[in-house]
Structure formats: C-alpha cells, structure tokens
Amino acid sequence: MISTVVWGTGNVGRLAIRAVEAHPALQLCAVIVHNPAKVGRDAGELGELDRLLGVEATDDIEAVLAARPRAVVYAASGDVRPDEALADITRAVRSGAVVVSPALYPLYDHRNAPPEFRDPVLAAVTEGGGSLFASGVDPGWGNDVLPLLLSGLGTTIDVIRCQEIFDYSTYDQPDSVRYLVGMGQPMDYEPMMLMPSIPTMVWGGQIRMMARALGVELDEIRETSDRRALDTTVTTRTMGEFGAGTQGAIRFEVQGIVEGEPRIVIEHVTRIHPSCAPDWPVPPDGGDGAHRVVIEGRPRIEVTIEATDEGENRSAGGNATAVGRLVGAIDWLVEAEPGLYDALDIPLRPAIGRLGRKQS
C-alpha cells in the first residue's frame, strides 16, 4: 500500500479523502489542515463519509513529512495564495513524496512554466527525489487528454474547441467568484481573471500541450473576452446576494493560432445566474454546468460531460473528476523516475479494482 497524505480539506480536499480511501493501492496515513477547529477530527468526518477512518487531522506539517509518506495530494488552494502553495508543494517534493495537485496552473505545462515556479520544484526534485503532477478539470483533462483522445477518432480536423459552461451560483468560494472572476462587482471593475495575459497564464499551457501532441506549431496565443450585467438582483444559497447592474456573466476564449487561424480554442461561459446572458451557450440539458469538446471536421464530433457529486452538485462533480485523475496517477508516479510530469506524460488509466466497490 502506498502511504498517502491529503493536505487541505476544503472543496477539493474532502473529495480527495474519499478518493484515496477508495483506491485499492493507497492507504490514507495523514490529513493536514490549516483550520485549528479541524485539528483532531477524524478523516472520515472531514471527508463526509458515514464512518471513521482512524486518521486524525493535524496541523503539524513537519511531523507528517518527517514520517516520509510516499504520496501527497495537495488540495489546498493556490488561486489566492500561489506563493504559499508553491512553498508547500516544494516542501513535500523535497521530502521525497510524489505530489499531485490542482493548484498552481503555471505548472500544468511545466516545460513552459515561468522560472519562478519551475525552478524551485526542480531543485526540490533533485534534493529529495520526489515528483509533481499538477492538473485539474479546466484547465486539466477537459482540454488535454479528452480532446486529444477525440481527435484520434477524426479523419480531418479544422478546429478543436473545449468549452466550460457553468453557473457559479452553487460554488462555495466567495473570494474567487467575487474578486477573481468579478461576479457582483461594478461593470467598471476589472476582474483578475480577465486581465490581459491572465487567461493565457492559466489556459495557455493547455493550448501548448495540445499543439505539441498534435504536432503543430503555434503562431501565437490570443485572448478574447466579453461581460454582461445582471438585469435583476439574485440570491445564491452559498454566497449571498449579487446586485442588479453588477457583473453577472463572463465569456472568454484562449485561442491557439495555427497558420493564421484559431485552430485550438478554450472557451469559458460563466454565469452567477442562468437568467444572465441567455443567448450565450448553455449546458445541453439546461443544468448548471457542463464540459464540452467539439471537433469541427470530418466527422464532426461533440462530447459533453456532466459530472455530479454531493447531492447532484456539478461543481462538486467537476472537482471529483479532477481528484480522480490525480489520485489515479499516484501509483504510476511512484513507479516512475523522480521529476516534473504533465498530462501528456501520464496515461489516463481505467479504475482498476474499483468497479462495484461501494463507498458511503
């Protein structure tokens, strides 16, 4: 069994606890928390299982890493604390652990990552012998392994378009939704998510990886964006009120330009309520979220994935798929050489040993 730590127990971490516990090759050995109120609580409770797992949460990072766990699922956020997340991840890699994480988007495409992100991790790999695989949903499998798999079914391909279409009203991340994405802010507020070069920083690596896998050279990466205001005030269950006249929806594209044309496109359509921008793309079933890949060519191929978890919640379902991809890579990484890995390095593997396995 591969001794595995889950670091962080928020929206991603509680799903990671469940994924590690369900994996037949992994053994949950520790859970690291930042909130003092969670110290001493059982991992089963934090993972919202109906049973205890016999692993108590701790905030003693040094003690956990000193025990030399073989793997760490780093589930703490890197969106609003990238420096701290990078320090945590390099610390775990330096301890010799295989680390998987959805944090730190620049490291999804590590070959082109800024030196300030890449170099500390490479130094930690050299010093401690650990590894890192960073990936998610979108950016993540929704615009790397999935579109590339589908492209292999085509005869000719004109455009690969990856879409995330989501209603954020079910999210429980008010800081990210209000300040990074800008929902509920005045229309003259410039959300960080749409600042020039930020979409490319987050999603450009996915464009580059797809281009590399497809054997094409990019002329450049372009960005487009649009915003819409709410017509009426809306109230969400988890994040409160969003006022009429404030930002209610954004739409942007990150485009990989090949021979002057946008051939690889990542598009996001994000709303805080379905009433905003009804003329923009919506999930095919009218639900609150979907990931879609459209291959324009011969044949035309369209695949939509709608994942749900935690009471039919699609944001939780999306997070669960990211966790599944990461946790499912741990045993492969343990057998591989130490290093930095990306989605093209790591095979998408079947759920060996998990078919029919029940989890409460």
Swiss-Prot record:
Recorded superkingdom: Bacteria
Stretch forming the signal peptide: none
Disulfide bonds: none
Root EC class: oxidoreductase
pH effects: Optimum pH is 10.0 for the oxidative deamination reaction, while the optimum pH of the reductive amination reaction is rather broad and between 6.5 and 7.0.
Family annotation (Gene3D superfamilies): NAD(P)-binding Rossmann-like Domain (3.40.50.720)
CDD domains named in the record: nat-AmDH_N_like (cd24146)
SUPFAM superfamilies: NAD(P)-binding Rossmann-fold domains (SSF51735)
Gene Ontology MF terms: 4-hydroxy-tetrahydrodipicolinate reductase
Gene Ontology biological process terms from the UniProt entry: lysine biosynthetic process via diaminopimelate
UniProt similarity note: Belongs to the amine dehydrogenase family.
Record-given protein name: Amine dehydrogenase
Species per Swiss-Prot/TrEMBL record: Streptomyces virginiae (Streptomyces cinnamonensis)
